[in-house]
Amino acid sequence: MKTIVATLLCGVALFAAGPLRRAPGFCLMDTSGQWQDLADYRGKIVLVEFMKTECPHCASFSTVLNGLKVKYGDKLAILAIANPPDNPQTMLQFVKGHNLTYPLLLDQGQAAYSYVRTPSLELPTLYLIDANGMIRNSWVDGVLTKDIFEGNGLSREIDKLLAGAPAKK
């Protein structure tokens, strides 16, 4: 019986992981008025975070992302993306209030939908993209992803990509 349950769980895990897919492209304006095109980051590891400025989990996660940017420097690009009802004013307040060291971009929903592929989005949601532009992993903040959103698990995942770990199947 244990073997059957273990086999089923492994099958569910493999199905949930799914195949690698190319990260959908986007070109969005940041809070300083600069256009940020995902294609410009090819060759780097990229974290794409979908967030909201009034989300307390997103606010606390910004500290983790700032720390990762310091730790990895130019080897890691971080792009945070907010959707309405956020606007340039609320976003600028968030950038200044949390001393963001990475760009915060405004999306009208197109980029978010192309990543998540569902009409609703839990926040924060994070995508890890490899240097070839492939989504290697994604996470939604929650009990099961606590290690990722506290930074330790995320650092391990980034280190694997920097070391040239093979893509998950």
PLM feature segments, named:
Residues 15-38:
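N-terminal "domain-start" segment that seeds a small globular fold
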Residues 45-46, 124:
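Alpha/beta-hydrolase fold active-site loops
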Residues 3-13:
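Sec-dependent N-terminal signal peptides
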Residues 50-67:
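Conserved redox-active cysteine motifs that mediate thiol-disulfide chemistry
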